[in-house]
Amino acid sequence: MTAYFITATGTDCGKTFITAALLAAARARGLSAHAYKPVMSGWRAEDTASDAHLLRAAGGNQQSLDALSCYRFAAPLSPHQAAAKEGTTIDWEQLVGWCRTHVATATPQSPCYLEGAGGVMTPITTTRTMRDLAAALAIPVILVSGTALGSISHTLTAIEALRAVNVPIHALILNESADSTIPLAEAHTAIAPFVRSIPHCLVQPHVASLTQAESFAALL
């Protein structure tokens, strides 16, 4: 499989950093990789530290900001709330179709990464969630989790939610939380017995640079 849906156990787990790292690692290997964030909230075009700018930079600035997403909203809320703030709604069929168009272009030499918003069960519309989008696309998920206290429960809950609708999980990435009091190795050891059926379980130390993308080579 050459297309992946990146989601998380919740907000601020580092999905965009991980997606950008995957993209940078793929491109470093000579692959023509692309990343997209179908729905963005908290969007500000002038914010050069935004998710969109990070993904664009990791991709060599080859994509326009408009090409990165199908929907963008200003309010930093769940997509359905952010859309309502602007007096609109998200067209589910349009969103799925937009994503499928990009998934269809993925090849071994040109992998595609689609990054969700928020967590697995973050609402997109009043009846659909990020889990539903992953299921509709029928592509494997890369699940990002933090390591702060409570993350084991959050992670296992997210895994069960995905499995309940037969979404395959390709990888679990433990992205070290900035405020975690639990050593990364201990966090990995604690959750490992519960995730043995997931093909890849990787750890990512808390860093501020994409230069440490080498740990993601196993996913490519």
What role is predicted for each listed range?
Residues 1-5, 32:
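Extreme N-terminal starter segment of soluble prokaryotic enzymes
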Residues 5-22:
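Glycine-rich phosphate-binding P-loop
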Residues 17-89, 93, 101-103:
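N-terminal phosphate/diphosphate-binding loop that engages ATP/GTP or pyrophosphate donors
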Residues 37, 142-145, 170-176:
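Short internal beta-strands
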Residues 79-124, 131:
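Phosphate-binding/switch loop-helix module in NTP-utilizing enzymes
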Residues 125-148:
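Inter-motif core of Ras-like GTPase G domains
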Residues 125-133, 156-159, 184-189:
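Charged helix-capping and loop-helix junction motifs
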Residues 160-220:
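C-terminal lobe/tail of nucleotide-utilizing enzymes
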